[in-house]
Amino acid sequence: MSTTLVLRFADVGVATYASLRIIGQPGGTVTWVLHEPIVLAALKELQAALPDPDGDESLTEALDRALTRGPFATAQGELTLAYILGALLISAPAWQLISDCVADPRPVLFISPSARLARIPWGLLAVPLTGPDPEELIAARKAAVTFKGTNAARIRWQLDDIDTVTEGLRLMELADVVLAVPPNIAHAPRIPVQWRERRSAPALLVVDPRVPGQRPDSPLGSVLGRPSSQTALSRHFGELLARRPVLPQVDAAVELFRRTDADRTWLATLLECAPSRLLFVGHASAADRAHGYADRAALHLACTAAAEGAAEPVGNHRPLLASDLMAAALPAPPRVALLACGSGGDYQFDEATGLVAAMVLCGSELVTATLWSLPTTAGYRRFTVRAEDPMAEIVIAVDKAHEDDDAVLSLNRWQREQMRRWRDGDVTASPLYWAALVTFAVGGAR
């Protein structure tokens, strides 16, 4: 049996309180406090790495920055970010407690982030050998609090030689990282479905559905590019078809892509067939934090504006909101993968009722999602001038992992492999993809 640890964060006023404990060991607990200027400093560093617009940036400018100039564009920049996040967000005693639990098999670390820390890629964090001078950190924290409000602390990092402050060991190398399903969702009335009961049933594959009225190169256009039987993804799904039945029933794998019939009625009909798992690859829209409701997060299927739902139409298309999914009580399978822009953003809201919560409330016990927008195949190739397709790689990796007995272990193993490729100089193993993946589990599901 592996050791289980739980890392929790809670925003209370201007501070974020953290605790780390070992399940079954009352004495194995560490607590610490993150002051608002420190949290803001961490978020500012992360924002510079993400392909989401910052300030007046356009989507295109944000993607260009993230792929070519941001911290995730080079191994040195990514390691520096990983070190800064590790030094700011996890206390030295907490790092020590995690290190003390390292064994074979790896411990499992369940993380419940606060709203402020909802998009932190926890597995990426690097173990610091040393951190900022404590007195300088206190001074920077105090200077960040002004009559006009609180700003990000301006910390004087000593980063001329990154190897002197971290050996590059990551949290994902110390433990298998899982996000805990928010308590209000995990304890809500629902009818869960277990993997062992459904594992032999067909997999439901919703792959890059065609959003009505959207050109292939538009913001809601194709994620994977022009369908072809010669692509790595088509070959992967072709091999899957040869081994087992899938939904929808198709004669060739290429027929899974860019379907025009994949609307909410089609989805509901196929979910009634009790599939073993659901893979969705496409577009999602995160709920607007200013709006205040996580259930406004949406999936973009092939639904026209005539479809029933609570979302406002986008041209001739009506998005499928998380609230629509919950209201319809669609029977979700035990495992769900939502490889879509920021689909794992539930924790950004006090009431974590986003897309992940919707799937759990509808029956799922394990949901894999993303923390931020994944660059499309076309976007990646445009700005890197490379022929590789990391979007296809992540889809294949998640699809294979969700077929395994222990999906959590398989996904963490793949992320470690990608991180080590990146660390060893393989520029095609971009952290914009592997670091974005998070898996939510309820009831000890693996």
Segments the model singles out, each with a brief description of its role:
Residues 1-121:
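Non-catalytic, solvent-exposed interaction/assembly segments
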Residues 74-76, 107-186, 288-312:
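Helix-enriched interaction subdomains in cytosolic or periplasmic regions
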Residues 114, 153-292:
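A domain-level signal for caspase-like cysteine endopeptidase catalytic cores
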Residues 120, 214-216, 287-291, 345-349, ...:
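Extracytoplasmic/secreted cell-surface and envelope-processing proteins
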Residues 179-182, 301-332, 373-446:
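Caspase-like cysteine protease fold
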Residues 260-268, 273-276, 284-365:
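Cysteine protease catalytic core and zymogen-processing segment of caspase-like enzymes
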Residues 366-370:
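Short hydrophobic alpha-helical runs that function as membrane-insertion/retention elements
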